[in-house]
């Protein structure tokens, strides 16, 4: 029952993800951060099989860091998204990863951006995107309330509406969510929306 969603506002991108580590009917953990920081101005929110998700996002993170180390300049968000898509496409015929990604970033020239990359290596630049069962409700909520000129406060309010909708509509809804923002000041954690604490 994973839920990952994000949107682009006026000079920033925001992503939110549930924090449940689930296998079949078992909940292993409810504080699993599924949003990885790629570098100072990029975030990757991922859903999918836990092993694939962790291994692939770490692989992308290390390769983005390696590129910056070798060349002295960071990859742009578009370049990082295209690299990620290429690696997924290469793996697709050999040992496919079951992982879906929303990549959010901020570049000086291009501004804030959000890229949708699914498990079969489809890549799209989007204003808003979502994966998982929660996407049915978060996408419809964002379709109704989203504006491209939203402030951070308005975007957080919209994210909270999406989380509320997911919690009220899904039979087995994820209880906790983490929210992260990337803008000209860098990538940072905004906060957690917790309804269940660890036992």
From Swiss-Prot:
Compartments where located: Cytoplasm; Nucleus
**UniProtKB keywords:** Acetylation, Cytoplasm, Nucleus, Proteasome
Ligase listed as a keyword: no
Which positions bear N-acetylmethionine?
Answer: 1
CDD domains the UniProt entry points to: proteasome_beta_type_2 (cd03758)
**Similarity comment:** Belongs to the peptidase T1B family.
What is this protein called in UniProt?
Answer: Proteasome subunit beta type-2-B
Organism annotation: Arabidopsis thaliana
């Amino acid at each position: 029952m994973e839920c990952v969603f994000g949107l682009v506002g006026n000079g920033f991108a925001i992503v939110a993800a549930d924090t449940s580590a689930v296998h079949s009917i078992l909940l292993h953990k409810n504080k699993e951060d599924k949003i990885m920081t790629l570098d100072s101005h990029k975030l990757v929110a991922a859903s999918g099989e836990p092993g694939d998700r962790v291994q692939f996002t770490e692989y992308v993170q290390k390769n983005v860091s390696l590129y910056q180390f070798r060349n002295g300049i960071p990859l742009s968000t578009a370049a990082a998204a295209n690299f990620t898509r290429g690696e997924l496409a290469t793996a697709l015929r050999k040992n496919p990863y079951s992982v879906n990604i929303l990549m959010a970033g901020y570049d000086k020239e291009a501004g804030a951006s959000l890229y949708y990359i699914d498990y079969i290596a489809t890549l799209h630049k989007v204003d808003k995107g979502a994966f998982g069962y929660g996407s049915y409700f978060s996408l419809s909520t964002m379709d109704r309330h989203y504006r491209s000129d939203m402030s951070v406060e308005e975007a957080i309010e919209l994210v909270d509406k999406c989380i509320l909708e997911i919690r009220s509509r899904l039979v087995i809804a994820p209880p906790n969510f983490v929210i992260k923002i990337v803008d000209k000041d860098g990538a940072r954690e905004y906060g957690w929306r917790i309804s269940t604490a660890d036992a």
